[in-house]
Amino acid sequence: MVAADSVVVIVRLTPRGGRDAIDGVAQLADGRSVLKVRVRAAASEGEANAALMKLIAKTLGVARRDVSLVAGASARLKHLRITGAGATLAATLEKICAMG
């Protein structure tokens, strides 16, 4: 979902994935598209969530404080809100997904 000042992204996170990386886009059974991401961190005490938000911030070139977890703190599917110019962030995400 893209707004003027932010974008919300659904992420399918794989903790202990061997490396920190964005692996592209996947289609869920219900038709939703999700960003596939893996992180080295384990899914304990919020470590994987922190690694996810750090990776997304670094990849998009935004401050870590501009990435927040909106839903899915203990689930594999997570909703992240990234604050900034929504259209610019969406375009950057599309480029990243095309490369993955």
Label every model-predicted segment.
Residues 1-54, 68-74, 79-100:
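Contiguous, often N-terminal, cationic amphipathic patches that form binding interfaces
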Residues 57:
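The alpha-helix within a helix-turn-helix
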Residues 64-66:
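Short acidic capping loops at alpha-helix termini that bridge into adjacent secondary structure
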